Design a protein with these regions (language model features):
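Membrane-embedded alpha-helical bundles that constitute the cytochrome b-like, heme-associated redox core
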Residues: 1-122
């Protein structure tokens, strides 16, 4: 289950990277909404799967990575909250601040990196 979660969140990271490239190349124009919606749905699905996978047996105790799963779900969950804030900002027809995108991406990539260590080392 944890490997499947890692793959799902990896797809969300790739979609998010594509959205970031599109945002930067079009000088802040709105990203295509179907792609943004797919990114959000895949990410939320991955977050849900990660929360379910963490209910299983403890892993990574010998390597010292036992808490990495909790850290990953916290970082990715925070990124998801900012993503929902981005959606609300878009629906209110306001310009999305660049710092919001940067914080969202930093939390998401950080959570994914911690998850990678948890899956591959733990």
């Amino acid at each position: 289950m944890l490997t499947t979660t890692f793959v799902i969140l990896g797809i969300a990271v790739l979609l998010g990277s594509l959205l970031a490239v599109l945002y930067l190349r079009t000088e802040g124009a709105a990203a295509p909404w179907p792609l943004a919606a797919l990114h959000g749905l895949v990410a939320i699905g991955g977050l849900f799967c990660l929360a379910l996978a963490l209910r299983g047996p403890l892993r990574g105790v010998e390597q010292g990575t036992a808490s990495f799963g909790i850290i990953a779900v916290t970082l990715i969950g925070s990124a998801a909250l900012i993503g929902v804030g981005s959606l609300v900002t878009h629906l209110l027809k306001r310009r999305l601040p660049g710092i919001l995108i940067g914080v969202h991406a930093t939390l998401a990539v950080g959570g994914f990196a911690i998850l990678a260590a948890y899956v591959l080392v733990g």
